[in-house]
Amino acid sequence: MIEGKTKSGFEYSIEEFKLDNWELLEVLNELGDSPNKIVSVLPYLFDEEQIKALKEHNRDKKTGVVTASGMTADIMDIFKNNKAKN
């Protein structure tokens, strides 16, 4: 199990086998052509409960909107944190 915390304070855990997934690599490869596909990464990493928690973590308190910038930053932090550990 890989556990960590993003710069914004979101605590996560990912089962290691989820990172050794060819289909995840395919989605990550497509990000170069279409950065908005980052949304497709989440189901490969997290279950529904953790996805919901990440969205709530990035929900703007005033507007109620889940910020794309916050979600993107947290997802990138998760990959950077994992890369640093390997």
Model-derived segments and their meaning:
Residues M1-K7:
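Short acidic, Pro/Gly- and aromatic-enriched capping/linker segments at domain boundaries
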Residues K7-E11, E15-N86:
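Short, surface-exposed, charged amphipathic helix/loop patches that serve as local interaction elements
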